[in-house]
């Protein structure tokens, strides 16, 4: 999205200036301006997937910064997308197959790129409760059908208007609360039974999370609410550093 993802990345950079210094120094932001399934259609060919940077350069020919970008100079590629599985012409099963393909292909930021999903949408970063995280009954799961007509955005706006206990991801301490809530939620979703959260962080890979999400999507028509950005931090900084930051 043109605004939300860029704003959230900027908030992350402000909250973690030292930890994300390398990322901040030469970051190039590119907006795809459509959903993940449209990207799939542009990338997919008979031999697999095309290079995402070259596809985006072709799409944004008028962008001089992007036009002058040498692919060999790009050391890391991170992709942030909403699940956006509601209101599609294709079936849920076909959409899940495409997402699975994409996650298996975009699984390394220094090679093809690393893909991160927000479930169901980027605004999910704004629903964490100060005490109950993402496990309150009103936000633990969200119906796919209720995402229609900006339904999830309206839900988030109403929640932020009516609730006095939302933890806003606008500073370092709050980001760490939001991150921990997302990791605890993933632990619940993935049935990781260890009593020690930090011992299972390494298992919270995007493709593994999606395997559990698609069971909910196909069988119950819901997703477990999760933000992409805590898992980006986990990937970028590593489980050990994240654990020390959350529980110093």
Give the label of every model feature segment:
Residues 6-29, 34-47, 56-248:
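C-terminal accessory helical subdomains adjacent to catalytic cores in phosphodiester-
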């Amino acid at each position: 999205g043109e605004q939300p993802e860029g704003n959230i990345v900027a908030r992350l950079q402000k909250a973690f200036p030292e930890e994300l210094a390398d990322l901040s120094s030469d970051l190039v932001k590119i907006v795809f301006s459509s959903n993940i399934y449209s990207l799939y259609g542009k990338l997919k060919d008979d031999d697999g997937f095309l290079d995402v940077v070259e596809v985006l350069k072709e799409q944004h020919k008028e962008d001089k910064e992007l036009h002058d970008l040498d692919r060999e100079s790009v050391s890391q590629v991170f992709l942030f997308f909403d699940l956006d599985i509601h209101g599609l012409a294709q079936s849920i099963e076909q959409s899940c197959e495409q997402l699975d393909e994409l996650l298996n292909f975009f699984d390394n930021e220094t090679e093809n790129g690393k893909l991160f999903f927000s479930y169901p949408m980027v605004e999910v970063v704004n629903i964490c409760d100060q005490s109950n995280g993402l496990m309150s009954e009103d936000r633990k799961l969200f119906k796919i059908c209720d995402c229609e007509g900006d339904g999830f955005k309206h839900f988030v706006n109403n929640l932020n208007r009516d609730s006095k206990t939302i933890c806003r991801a606008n500073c370092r301490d709050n980001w760490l609360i939001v991150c921990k809530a997302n990791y605890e939620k993933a632990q619940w979703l993935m049935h990781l039974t260890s009593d020690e959260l930090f011992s299972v962080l390494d298992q919270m890979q995007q493709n593994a999370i999606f395997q559990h999400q698609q069971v909910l999507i196909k069988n119950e028509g819901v997703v477990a609410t999760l933000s992409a950005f805590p898992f980006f931090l986990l990937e970028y900084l590593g489980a050990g550093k994240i654990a020390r930051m959350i529980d110093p």
